[in-house]
């Protein structure tokens, strides 16, 4: 039906007759001529309809926004004075010769010329996607997916599909369950990742695997999470963690170069412990110059228990952030930041303004200065390299609370005060994660997943002292977002059973949930390692937006609902009966 896309027309086609299909973006009547901005997925071009073309003019007179039309016309260059530099096709226009209405449109429930609510946009997503901004994002996503496939194909990886209906295994989040009609009372689980299947593919000898795959997690949502998301899943045999990081870093660097013409440069590598110490986060945004500085040794002997208590607690921490120019913050602003850190469990936010460094104690303004000696204050000023006009903000509590609260405050201050270098890129690798993390009851949980290999330990050594073990894991971080994470996997049954034991998974449960994996590990399993990228998050960064819903064609809300299709919905009673499922929600509600 068409010979060209609207957005592809240029001066080289002047004089040629073209056929276009698309939508009326805008229609204007000017001095007898009708002008139509015609739009398709590739862009917009101006169409001129002259009254001399009677049939086309009669049709053009009926057009309204979002009518679907077909146009036949001649490409002509615009006079220099009429060139529209705001349009990619602004040097040309189409003189209409034939015009056909393919389909009319009702008045839209969305106004493309103003900001619509997200609820309206999601309810009428098929209309929202017509907006050039949204169309460009979805096209960039397609280019990113195409690039990934091309890169991995060229590097010897095989695209292999893994099951979607599978077995529930503990991977950190709740599973989406699918009832079996054939095996009544039993359920499949939708995969949170293809983790075990890709490891089994390595045991099958496929060496290098990849898949762009849907994954499902029933977890609390936020701006950069969805119940169903897309993963670039990668696994390799006979490659070290350094080699896996090298090939995946190369992929991301070449992707940014091809799609954005940006050279990310070589990624620095930072141990987990350093990331937490300096930035309070295992995914630090290095565009932000603010850092956490430990001062526990300076305040451990002061009479102020708010500081000395955590400073002398092996699980405590006292750290500060020096904010350049922060002495200008008002008391109201400081109170607002205090309320902000309260969200993360901090009990307060002590502060110290350095109004005049040269004036000694006279130049210091702080509600806690009276509890600190001049030597302690000078020690803090020297360690933080504070200057006149700065403010120092304190965190003193359990180490995890201090890291989380000051880490979040660091990001907020960076944005609020314009310290974060927007429009730049700061990638890095975070490595050497703890193997386990401890809950409030003292139980150990896998920080990544239970198939991650420890670094430099035998099974016996790990079982003897598991808490301080370091895992052979690595995360790729970009501008404060974890865009990919992976590890070297456990490749022998003894080590895997040891990890399960440490996590409190007894022998019977191991056999029930992971018997197939433990069996497979007995048959000459190769060393293997891998990594998975969140495609949605990568594309979100490529597009310069902060919400992955902006780069998914048909996303869910933060309540995991689809406003367009009204999913999830109540199931047909006959279908539930066939599945031997009884719904108790209504009974529970009536009982309340």
UniProtKB/Swiss-Prot annotation:
GO terms assigned for molecular function: aspartate-tRNA ligase activity; ATP binding; nucleic acid binding
Record region (Aspartate): 195-198
Chief location of this protein within or outside the cell: cytoplasm
Broad enzyme group: ligase
Superkingdom of source: Bacteria
PROSITE patterns tied to this protein: AA_TRNA_LIGASE_II (PS50862)
EC code: 6.1.1.12
Reaction catalysed by this enzyme: tRNA(Asp) + L-aspartate + ATP = L-aspartyl-tRNA(Asp) + AMP + diphosphate
Binding-site residues for L-aspartate, renumbered to this chain: 171, 217, 448, 489
Keywords from the UniProt entry: Aminoacyl-tRNA synthetase, ATP-binding, Cytoplasm, Ligase, Nucleotide-binding, Protein biosynthesis
Subcellular localization(s) per the UniProt record: Cytoplasm
Entry-linked SUPFAM superfamilies: Class II aaRS and biotin synthetases, GAD domain-like, Nucleic acid-binding proteins
Binding site for ATP: 217-219, 226, 482, 534-537
BP GO annotations: aspartyl-tRNA aminoacylation
CDD domains (alphabetical): AspRS_core (cd00777), EcAspRS_like_N (cd04317)
Cellular component GO terms held in the UniProt record: cytoplasm
Keyword Chloroplast found: no
InterPro entries in UniProt: Aa-tRNA-synt_II, aa-tRNA-synth_II, aa-tRNA-synth_II/BPL/LPL, Asp-tRNA-ligase_1, Asp-tRNA-ligase_1_N, Asp/Asn-tRNA-synth_IIb, AspRS_core, GAD-like_sf
The keyword Ubl conjugation appears for this protein: no
Record-stated family: Belongs to the class-II aminoacyl-tRNA synthetase family. Type 1 subfamily.
Oligomeric and partner information: Homodimer.
Cross-referenced NCBIfam families: aspS_bact, PRK00476.1
Known function: Catalyzes the attachment of L-aspartate to tRNA(Asp) in a two-step reaction: L-aspartate is first activated by ATP to form Asp-AMP and then transferred to the acceptor end of tRNA(Asp).
UniProt protein name: Aspartate--tRNA ligase
Lineage of source species: Bacteria, Pseudomonadati, Pseudomonadota, Gammaproteobacteria, Vibrionales
């Amino acid at each position: 039906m068409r010979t060209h896309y609207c957005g592809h027309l240029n001066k080289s086609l002047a004089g040629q007759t073209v056929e276009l299909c698309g939508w009326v973006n805008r229609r204007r009547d000017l001095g007898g001529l009708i002008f139509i901005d015609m739009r398709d997925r590739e862009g917009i071009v101006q169409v001129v309809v002259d009254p001399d073309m009677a049939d086309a003019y009669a049709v053009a007179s009926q057009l309204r926004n979002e009518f679907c039309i077909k146009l036949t016309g001649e490409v002509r260059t615009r006079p220099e004075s009429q060139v529209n530099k705001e349009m990619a096709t602004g040097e040309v226009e189409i003189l209409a010769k034939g015009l056909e209405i393919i389909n009319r449109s009702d008045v839209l429930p969305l106004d493309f010329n103003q900001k619509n609510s997200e609820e309206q946009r999601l309810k009428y997503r098929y209309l929202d996607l017509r907006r050039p901004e949204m169309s460009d994002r979805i096209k960039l996503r397609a280019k990113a997916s195409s690039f990934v496939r091309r890169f991995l194909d060229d590097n010897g990886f095989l695209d292999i599909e893994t099951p979607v209906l599978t077995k529930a295994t503990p991977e950190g989040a709740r599973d989406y369950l699918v009832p079996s009609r054939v095996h009544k009372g039993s359920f499949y689980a939708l995969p949170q990742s293809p983790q075990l299947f890709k490891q089994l593919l390595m045991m099958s000898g496929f060496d290098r695997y990849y898949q762009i795959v849907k994954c499902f997690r029933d977890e609390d949502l936020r701006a950069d999470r969805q119940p169903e998301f897309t993963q670039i899943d990668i696994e390799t045999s006979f490659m070290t963690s350094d080699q896996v990081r090298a090939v995946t870093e190369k992929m991301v660097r070449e992707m940014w170069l091809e799609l954005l013409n940006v050279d990310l440069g070589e990624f620095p590598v930072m141990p987990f412990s350093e990331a937490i110490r300096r930035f309070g986060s295992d995914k630090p945004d290095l565009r932000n110059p603010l850092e956490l500085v430990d001062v526990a040794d300076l305040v451990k002997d002061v009479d102020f228990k708010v500081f000395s208590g955590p400073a002398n607690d092996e699980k405590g921490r006292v750290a500060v952030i020096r904010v350049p120019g922060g002495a200008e913050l008002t008391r109201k602003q400081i109170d607002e930041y205090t309320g902000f850190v309260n969200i993360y469990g901090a009990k307060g936010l002590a502060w110290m303004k350095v109004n005049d460094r040269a004036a000694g104690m006279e130049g210091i303004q702080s509600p806690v200065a009276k509890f600190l000696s001049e030597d302690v204050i000078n020690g803090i000023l020297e360690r933080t390299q504070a200057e006149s006009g700065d403010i120092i903000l304190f965190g003193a509590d359990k180490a995890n609370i201090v890291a989380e609260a000051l880490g979040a405050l660091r990001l907020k201050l960076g944005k609020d005060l314009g310290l974060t270098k927007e429009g730049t890129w700061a990638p890095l690798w975070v490595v050497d994660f703890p193997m386990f993390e401890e809950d409030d009851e003292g139980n150990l949980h896998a920080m990544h997943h239970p198939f991650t290999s420890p670094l430099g330990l035998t099974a016996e050594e790990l079982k003897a002292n598991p808490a301080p073990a370091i895992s052979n894991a690595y995360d790729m971080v970009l501008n404060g977002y974890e865009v990919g994470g992976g590890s070297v996997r456990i490749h022998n049954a003894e080590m895997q059973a040891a990890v399960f034991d440490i996590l409190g998974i007894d022998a019977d449960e191991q056999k029930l949930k992971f018997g197939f994996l433990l069996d497979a590990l007995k048959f000459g399993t190769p060393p293997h390692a891998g990594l998975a990228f969140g495609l949605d998050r990568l594309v979100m960064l490529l597009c310069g937006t902060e919400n992955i819903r902006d780069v998914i064609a048909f996303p869910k809300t933060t309540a995991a609902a689809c406003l367009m299709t009204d999913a999830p919905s109540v199931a047909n009673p006959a279908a539930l009966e066939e599945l031997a499922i009884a719904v108790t929600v209504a009974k529970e509600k009536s009982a309340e």
